[in-house]
């Protein structure tokens, strides 16, 4: 296996290269073609989302028995036969046409009789909007108090985000009721009166056992970040217990950016006879993210280098990923003491604090967030221009092997919706160096080394990418903030 040195692109080589995608090429021309984008609709066209260059590979289980069975991909929302109130909601968010993943997955998810689905696609390609549209299409809103759809997420932050997307896309749906089944929200003993429930597996399992949630008419179950939930022993057990409590005919939809082979096999049993949308490993990493690394002299020097990067972090917004809660809190304490404005967010905070911290970050009140893997997956803040891997993600007993999937999810917090972004990973010893080397080899990443001996050049290199990110801000669709009406 090639070591990290063979994956490194020297800075002078980068400067000499012509970028594969310039901002002008990435940003669609104003051609009148409808697309998913924010900003002035008259000036924008195309998708605006991170669109894979590959055509989505769709494996249809029925083709095993009948090779002539056709399937189609929607090119407009109207092709899907969606309700007018859903169309209105999608258009109000500038989701003007389906992304590739949405166009491939929605006809399959909405087919009758309902079929299970396992869908894999890069971060920022519109997976959440896809399964939310499917959920809202399956629910009978003439029965607003009857639970009919259940979405599970690995963290309260992601559950809250999905809840927000449901409310945004369904903003024009009459009698829509959505409930969050996360710790500290639902009154104990009171029945859940909502047609759509979004929650974490443990809380959902508890309210089913306490008979607060009527599961008799649930039609669809969604697992977002499904590989993470099915692979973790605790979450996987909870998800399986929840599924076994639900009606046997329920439609199961599994979504994630990554599906390791061992999880894929289990997912196939969790959602049998499923349609499958899959990516090749080489297409998993997001090309719009400039992936860099810094070789720190030792573990203690990582903090000093982090502080030197602070000015770059606040050009846009940044997320710093660390291994432990204690590390997050300690780095926050030291940076605040050194005069930097940062916030830490991890699972040791109570639910209300976590909700408040993430809201402030979304609104731009906090520019820099220090966190653990609790925010590695699914969280969508389109203005994040930089991700820092203060600690390389590891897994296995004793952290013996690199966690390549978590690395991919972490850096996917930037480069959202086709915008560019920067990820910077800190290495300081042979173990961290080798771990990043293996991740780079696995995904075919060409890493750029930032020279700490010449900070001016390093800063210019990072700043160039971040400014491109900000220049593309008008191309980022928001699933929670509608475009302001003309003249508003």
Swiss-Prot record:
Tell whether Transport is among the UniProt keywords: yes
What are the alphabetically sorted keywords of the record?
A: ATP-binding, Cytoplasm, Helicase, Hydrolase, Membrane, mRNA transport, Nuclear pore complex, Nucleotide-binding, Nucleus, Protein transport, RNA-binding, Translocation, Transport
Q: Where in the cell is it found?
A: Cytoplasm; Nucleus, Nuclear pore complex; Nucleus membrane
- Domain Helicase ATP-binding, which positions? 108-277
Name one cellular component (GO) term. cytoplasm
Q: Start and end of every Helicase C-terminal domain?
A: 305-466
Task: Give the PROSITE patterns listed for this entry.
Answer: DEAD_ATP_HELICASE, HELICASE_ATP_BIND_1, HELICASE_CTER, Q_MOTIF
Bias (Low complexity) occurs at: 16-30
**Motif Q motif residues?**
75-103
Chain span(s) of sequence motif DEAD box:
224-227
Classify the main location: cytoplasm
Q: Where does ATP bind?
A: 121-128
Q: What's the Enzyme Commission number for this chain?
A: 3.6.4.13
Q: Which SUPFAM superfamilies match?
A: P-loop containing nucleoside triphosphate hydrolases
Recorded topology in the membrane: Peripheral membrane protein
Q: Which GO terms describe its biological process?
A: mRNA transport; protein transport
> Which is an annotated GO molecular function term of this record?
ATP hydrolysis activity
Q: InterPro entries from the xrefs?
A: DEAD/DEAH_box_helicase_dom (IPR011545), Helicase_ATP-bd (IPR014001), Helicase_C-like (IPR001650), P-loop_NTPase (IPR027417), RNA-helicase_DEAD-box_CS (IPR000629), RNA_helicase_DEAD_Q_motif (IPR014014)
Q: What top-tier enzyme class does this entry carry? A: hydrolase
Its domain comment says:
The Q motif is unique to and characteristic of the DEAD box family of RNA helicases and controls ATP binding and hydrolysis.
Cite the record's note on assembly: Associates with the nuclear pore complex.
The UniProt entry's sequence similarity note says: Belongs to the DEAD box helicase family. DDX19/DBP5 subfamily.
State the PANTHER family in the record: ATP-DEPENDENT RNA HELICASE DBP3 (PTHR47958)
Any idea what job this protein has? ATP-dependent RNA helicase associated with the nuclear pore complex and essential for mRNA export from the nucleus. May participate in a terminal step of mRNA export through the removal of proteins that accompany mRNA through the nucleopore complex. May also be involved in early transcription.
**The protein's name in its UniProt record:** ATP-dependent RNA helicase DBP5
Species whose genome carries this gene = Gibberella zeae (strain ATCC MYA-4620 / CBS 123657 / FGSC 9075 / NRRL 31084 / PH-1) (Wheat head blight fungus)
Gene encoding the protein: DBP5
